[in-house]
Amino acid sequence: MIGRARPLMFLGTGSDVGKSVLAAAFCRILKQDGYSVAPFKAQNMALNSYITPEGGEMGRAQVVQAEAAGIEPHVDMNPVLLKPTSQMGSQVIVRGRAIGNYSAQEYYEYKKNLVEVVRESYERLAARYDVVVLEGAGSAVELNLKEHDLVNLAMAKMADAPCILVGDIDRGGIFAALLGSTMLMTPDERDRTIGFIVNKLRGDPRLFASGVDILESRSGLPVFGVVPHFDHIALPEEDSVALGRRARRVETRGSEDALMVGVVRLPYVSNYTDFDCLEHEPDVELLYFDRPEQVFGFDAVILPGSKNTIEDLAFLRKNGMAEAVVAFYKSGGTVVGLCGGYQMMGLRVSDPHGVESSIREIAGLGLLDMETEMFQDKVTSQVTALNIGGSGLEVSEDDALRGYEIHMGRSASMGGARPLFRIVSRDGLPVQVEDGLIQPGGRAWGTYIHGIFDNDGLRKAFLAGLKSRSGKTRVALSAGFSYQDWKNEQYDRLADHIRQHVDVKRIRRIIGLW
């Protein structure tokens, strides 16, 4: 074993089976039991990312797990992050810093250079914590990818980690998935696998008792638990599968008792975790949509972050969404842009160096009087900012707003709209930098700061403005909702749910935690 930590790894029979959630649950459970715990995923591919206090970029799943463990996120918890920029390529981020855009073939050729990077990151965590909870990616036994494996059984061997194989019974084929996965393992890999968790059962777990017997008798491995599907716990999700689920909810809109907020679903959307806090506000219905005719009827439309602003803007123009959003604003609606969405709201976006696209220049929506140019260097910083924009977002100028920047472009105001925020610190260092723009009246504004809605005061001010403009007198805006308190409640609920349905004590004994 590397370092002093006891490792425990969750492997999956496929994507979206619940590895990330179970890893977060065990981070919380072991924290509650008095252990210092850190999450770890060697390589993550994600639409959403986060900036650490040191200015490093990492995947949001490990941020959630770190929060559940009660510790500050660090890039060692996710040393390699892949952010898709096209159908065939990704931006590769190593130890929190972007090293370039790679095609799949180029990345496979480069991957061997990352083994020691991953090992060193894991060793640092293992030396600092009692337990490291590791997470694999996708299926643990993709045989055609095994030669280049960095995140699944190769990582388990590197960390000498006992592994729990997780299967999703809701999608069907649980026996083939779990038993078939173990059959494809080498003898050493099977020896490292300590048991199964059957996840996402709809109904009474007791009705699967015969299934547990079949799995245990055919594999010789224990089933540590059968976890029911839950709806009473809400956790941030980071992959495109989750976004698809959210987009299908658009047909539920129409309530006069809630503020209706629509997020445009972009082909290269990123950091849609920016809207989790709004999604769980008691008086808000937040929905994702991608058809122009859906825009009217919302109280506000948000253009989210993008991994390819120019291509996404071209998409909006092609399918008519750009015209619809402008018409929505002209009819009295509120439009907000975050990061790439903020860039789209300007007069034009140019990319003379081909950073994102072969398109060198494209017209923006013209809702904010600014222009954006893409540059090779990437801004990644945690920031503290003050509101200076006034009208429409009445937050005290003394209220410190916290968030983070992740962007390749630089935007310059052409006059007209007012600066929205003044950034007063980046990665803990004092600065004086204006950010964002807001039109008089507050119906059009944008910012580069991700996580801006996580600030309770600003979010409440934004919603109060929407209520006033919408005339929805029945909306009662809950004053007591704290997003941070709400998240901690979800982590505790998750821990309770897993303790109820998984033999946590048995797992603890196996990994040496008595």
UniProtKB/Swiss-Prot annotation:
Span of the signal peptide: none
Pfam families in the cross-refs: CbiA (PF01656), GATase_3 (PF07685)
Domain GATase cobBQ-type positions: 258-458
UniProtKB keywords: Cobalamin biosynthesis, Glutamine amidotransferase
One example of a Gene Ontology biological process annotation: cobalamin biosynthetic process
Residues at the catalytic site: C339 (nucleophile), H450
Pathway named in the protein's UniProt entry: Cofactor biosynthesis; adenosylcobalamin biosynthesis
GO MF annotations in UniProt: ABC-type vitamin B12 transporter activity; catalytic activity
Family label: Belongs to the CobB/CobQ family. CobQ subfamily.
Main function: Catalyzes amidations at positions B, D, E, and G on adenosylcobyrinic A,C-diamide. NH(2) groups are provided by glutamine, and one molecule of ATP is hydrogenolyzed for each amidation.
Protein name: Cobyric acid synthase
Gene: cobQ
